[in-house]
A protein has these predicted regions:
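Basic- and aromatic-enriched surface patches that contact anionic nucleotides/nucleic acids
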Residues: 2-280, 284, 555, 561
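Short amphipathic alpha-helical segments and their helix-coil junctions
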Residues: 14-18, 188-218, 226-229, 319-352, ...
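Short beta-strand-alpha-helix junction that forms the catalytic/metal-binding core
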Residues: 24-28, 33, 518, 528-561
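Conserved structured core elements
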Residues: 32, 220-224, 228, 240, ...
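A cross-family structural signal marking well-folded subdomains
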Residues: 245-247, 276-465
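Intrinsically disordered, low-complexity N-proximal targeting/linker segments that flank membranes
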Residues: 393-533, 537, 542-545
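Long, cytosolic, alpha-helical-rich C-terminal regions that act as interaction/scaffolding modules
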Residues: 547, 557-587
């Protein structure tokens, strides 16, 4: 095994040189997360103020034992803030998340921000500081205030601090000027950290030598292949990369010259690992004339090592560096995202199509569209979302749609696809038809309301043929629609675009529920139905609706959870709030 905390490196390979790191002597095989964490302590504050997406490492100057976690033996606490949590985390070693009420109170008291306001925007990391800290100071600021003797220079620190903006500066200055500021202790700690030796295991040359089989193949890429095998073995330890991320890492090892293009094009669209997968599949699809399967490690290895595929390799590299951006811009226009159309997908749903329904996104990139009329784009977007949200065989739908659009890019081709793929979709109905079918008992029919059930009252029938017809016509749509939050996000697309304009769906860490800037708020509070022991005869009926999208709205995390028992009429007391929540006046 590899000792904890070590880096694993290897001598840089000439074939992997790229302009941004052509002087690098070694390449990192394992320890990327540790390297990124260490780098936080050296990020220049000026660069942080210019880039709101950076995380910040802080040191709390407070030494009061009463403010330390009960199980801590430290003199000082390190804290971190991230774009998803610009207010920081709880004061312990676990990655605890601060409660919405605490965040809301702090923003109101310190920044005069009302999270319930329609104009509220989440602060950036440089505008905030860890709110669960007393005197936080960026570690990079402390390091930049060290003098040539390796001592923390108090005057230089105060001078650097005076150039900073933020709500934390006043407390920091007061602490530094105060009598309890332990300059020597902090200096000693920083000096120890800066003088520490980071241990790295240099991969033995024998591990990187070509195997007998590779020597016989006369392949110039054998060095990279051996590193690939080593990297895969290392990936069995620590934080594992998923299959697609591992493939992307191997692609970067073989063809580092495409990395810059992929990083740039992926921003605000999708993760780099998905974009590279789609780009390779697109060229492979065009060369074969049939839909290429998702990439595998063996596919990449064959492509890299087969001397007969040199032309294909060059075609892929040229496409990514010269044409991929234009192709993605075309897809942006088709899905109504850039330029933004009233019917277009918000970025989060655009990214969802690419990540959860990649065959559908691949189909959009695989067709060489000319400039398309808006009505066609809108209809095609409708078909894509129909397939994504109500389709049960998206590979078949995408393949048939690709074939039909190759013959003619027209609305007729889209209609033909729906007809040919009717068995691949849940049947949809017009809103008025659905409203009539799901008609609920009236208030003067209390017994029917008490016993109402989705299946019993809508699908089941004493006539077996009638029940089968109800099930085939309606059940698939009802089951999908009730829980599909993508439909909810689309209904609230204007609000999502405006309120969360800085949300970047290409960052996988922001997909996690606790990192996403919105939460799903129960309009009728769940507190009235969840685990409630009551004699209310209508509770069963309410529970069946409480967790459907009809009772949800996407709402800012900081403002949600403040009204867990507040009735809908009170929290939706403005017309604009109703509109943003996609609720009509009569509802």
């Amino acid at each position: 095994g590899i000792p904890i905390g070590f880096f694993v490196i290897c001598k840089a390979i000439a074939e992997q040189r790229k302009t941004s790191d052509d002087k690098a002597q070694y390449q990192l095989l394992d320890g990327q997360q540790r390297a990124n964490a260490i780098a936080l302590g050296f990020n220049d504050w000026n660069s942080i103020e210019k880039d709101s997406k950076q995380s910040i490492l802080w040191l709390d100057l407070d030494t009061n034992p009463e403010n330390m976690p009960s199980d801590s033996s430290r003199n000082f606490l390190f804290r971190v803030t991230t774009p998803a949590h610009p207010w920081g985390y709880t004061k312990n070693d676990a990655e605890g998340y601060l409660g919405a009420a605490k965040i809301r109170t702090f923003l109101k008291d310190k920044l005069n921000l009302d999270t319930s306001s329609l104009k509220y925007k989440r602060p950036t990391t440089c505008e905030l500081a860890p709110i669960d800290a007393t005197c936080p100071v960026p570690v990079s600021l402390l390091i930049s205030s060290m003098n040539s003797n390796g001592e923390l220079d108090k005057n230089l620190l105060l001078d650097n601090l005076s150039k900073c903006k933020g709500i934390w500066t006043e407390n920091a200055e007061e602490a530094i000027r105060g009598s309890k500021f332990n300059l020597s202790l902090i200096s000693e700690g920083l000096r120890t950290a800066l003088n520490s030796t980071i241990l790295a295991i240099n991969t033995p040359a024998k591990l990187l030598e070509p195997s007998l089989q590779e020597n016989q193949s006369d392949n110039s890429r054998s060095n990279i292949t051996n590193i690939e095998h080593l990297f895969q073995r290392l990936n069995q330890q620590g934080t594992r990369l998923d299959g697609e991320e591992l493939i992307y890492s191997l692609i970067k090892a073989y063809w580092p010259e495409i990395t810059t293009s992929i990083d740039r094009i992926a921003q605000n669209r999708m993760a780099c690992s998905r974009l590279i997968n789609l780009a390779f599949r697109l060229i492979l699809t065009e060369n074969s004339g049939t839909f290429s399967a998702p990439l595998s490690i063996s596919t990449i290895r064959r492509l890299a090592k087969d001397t007969e595929k040199e032309q294909l390799r060059e075609e892929i590299i040229a496409f990514i560096n010269e044409k991929l951006d234009t192709v993605c811009q075309t897809v942006d226009a088709i899905l109504g995202m850039k330029p933004q159309s009233s019917w277009g997908l918000p970025p989060v749903l655009y990214s969802e199509i690419a990540h959860q329904h990649q065959d559908l996104y691949l189909m959009l990139t695989a067709k060489k569209y000319q400039e398309l009329p808006e009505d066609f784009c809108r209809t095609l977007t409708g078909l894509i979302t129909y397939a994504a949200w109500f389709g049960n065989d998206q590979r078949t739908i995408a393949s048939i749609l690709y074939k039909n659009l190759n013959q003619q890019a027209s609305i007729e081709a889209l209609q033909k696809t729906v007809k040919e793929c009717s068995h691949c979709f849940a049947r949809l109905h017009q809103p008025d038809e659905a409203a009539a079918f799901i008609a609920l008992p009236s208030s003067d029919q209390p017994d029917q309301i008490k016993s109402w059930n989705w299946w019993k009252d809508l699908i089941a029938d004493s006539d077996a043929a009638k029940q089968q017809e109800n099930e085939s016509q309606w059940w698939g749509m009802l089951c999908t629609m009730r829980q599909n939050k993508s439909l909810l996000l689309y209904a609230q697309r204007e609000f999502i675009r405006k309120r969360f304009s800085s949300y970047d769906p290409s960052r996988k860490d922001l997909w996690l529920e606790h990192n996403r800037p919105w939460d799903y708020d129960h309009i009728l509070p769940a507190a009235y139905t969840y685990n409630i022991k009551t004699n209310n005869e209508f509770a069963g009926f309410c529970k069946q609706w409480c967790n459907t999208i009809g009772n949800f709205r996407a709402w800012p995390y900081e403002d949600n959870r403040s009204d867990q028992a507040e009735m809908a009429g009170k929290k939706l007391n403005q017309t604009k709030l109703l509109e943003d929540s996609f609720i009509s006046d009569d509802e």
